């Protein structure tokens, strides 16, 4: 035995259980606001219970998990934590809507070297706000204080979401046909992708995040939360024959559009059908980034691309605009030759 008679505690090792309990009390109100009628019980149990909505005849569960990448580093540098949770929810639920699924519930994982209750409460309040925007319930989560694993009060977040779709209504891209129209739904900014390049551009150019651009600071443009498309997209799906939806995330146009296209088809995008939001123009100029690389890294102002019959395109655009989205016809589906790229931007 050691000659040291002092009694060690978990807190001495860097884990403050009282801080964790204080956080749970702080976030209870935010979590309660996200509740759906299918949720059984409150937070704090070992597992969270949720019934399936009764309106589905053959319900299929759709799941997704994601993080926010190095956008988090920017939030830490700017000491602004109240919207990063919205990003986290958006990255998960927007992947579900691609298959026509309505998000049901969400869980989060928050890991840090030393728990700052105020910062964590801000993050989780943002997660709750994202869940409200998406119409899903925040039913549980894990807060892990891990001294020695993270530097100081640095933290990381991950999210997990489950949604439901009627089996016969699953959107999987198999109906995509030559001649289909492509409509774009506008993004709110870079969303949560490409931030390693964003940070490199800031470093190499020496740009100041407090510099003004179109009435806002560069930092504000870059921390603008990811748009959550659930409510407007569900309305569109209800009223139109949607053949495919692509969520433009990491890998941009070149990587994400082909994921929903059948073999032998390609998306022909009219690059002149929209003007890039100013933040993308600024990033390209400051980083001297080639246009193809921009399309391969960023969403360039396009959050979703939707394939549907040509004769329904204008009505779908009008509906999305009525729901407050920026939407426009961005291109069409054409036949692709063997070995040809599935995305063509003119």
From Swiss-Prot:
GO CC annotations, alphabetized: cytosol
Pathways involved: Purine metabolism; IMP biosynthesis via de novo pathway; 5-amino-1-(5-phospho-D-ribosyl)imidazole from N(2)-formyl-N(1)-(5-phospho-D-ribosyl)glycinamide: step 2/2
Keyword Nucleotide-binding part of the UniProt annotation: yes
Disulfide links within the chain: none
EC main group: ligase
Subcellular location: Cytoplasm
Catalytic activity: 2-formamido-N(1)-(5-O-phospho-beta-D-ribosyl)acetamidine + ATP = 5-amino-1-(5-phospho-beta-D-ribosyl)imidazole + ADP + phosphate + H(+)
EC number: 6.3.3.1
Gene name of the record: purM
SUPFAM superfamilies associated with the record: PurM C-terminal domain-like (SSF56042), PurM N-terminal domain-like (SSF55326)
Originating organism: Vibrio vulnificus (strain YJ016)
Protein name, as recorded: Phosphoribosylformylglycinamidine cyclo-ligase
């Amino acid at each position: 035995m050691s000659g040291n008679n002092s009694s060690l505690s978990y807190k001495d090792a860097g884990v403050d259980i009282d801080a964790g309990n204080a956080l749970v009390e702080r976030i209870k109100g935010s979590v309660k606001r996200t509740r759906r009628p299918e949720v059984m019980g409150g937070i704090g149990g070992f597992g969270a219970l949720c019934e399936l909505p009764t309106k589905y005849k053959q319900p299929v569960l759709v799941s997704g998990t994601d993080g926010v990448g190095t956008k988090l580093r920017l939030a830490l540098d700017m000491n602004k934590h109240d919207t990063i949770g919205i990003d986290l929810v958006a990255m998960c639920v927007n992947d579900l809507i691609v298959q026509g699924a309505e998000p049901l519930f969400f869980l989060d994982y928050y890991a840090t070297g030393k728990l700052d209750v105020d910062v964590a409460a801000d993050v989780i309040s943002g997660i709750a706000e994202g869940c409200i925007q998406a119409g899903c319930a925040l039913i549980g989560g894990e807060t892990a204080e891990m001294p020695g694993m993270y530097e100081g009060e640095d933290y990381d977040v991950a999210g997990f979401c489950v949604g439901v779709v009627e089996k016969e209504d699953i959107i999987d891209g198999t109906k995509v046909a030559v001649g289909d129209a492509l409509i774009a739904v506008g993004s709110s900014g870079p969303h949560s992708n490409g931030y390693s390049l964003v940070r490199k551009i800031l470093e190499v150019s020496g740009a100041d995040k407090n510099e003004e651009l179109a009435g806002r600071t560069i930092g504000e443009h870059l921390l603008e939360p990811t748009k959550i498309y659930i409510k407007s997209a569900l309305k569109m799906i209800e009223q139109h024959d949607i053949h495919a939806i692509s969520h433009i995330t990491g890998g941009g146009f070149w990587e994400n559009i082909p994921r929903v296209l059948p073999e032998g088809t390609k998306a022909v995008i009219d690059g002149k059908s929209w003007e890039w939001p100013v933040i993308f123009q600024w990033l390209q100029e400051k980083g001297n980034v080639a246009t193809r690389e921009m399309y391969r890294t960023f969403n360039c102002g396009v959050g979703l691309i939707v394939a549907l019959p040509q004769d329904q395109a204008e009505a779908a655009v009008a509906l999305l605009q009525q729901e407050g989205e920026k939407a426009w016809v961005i291109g069409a589906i054409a036949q692709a030759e063997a070995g040809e790229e599935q995305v063509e931007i003119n």
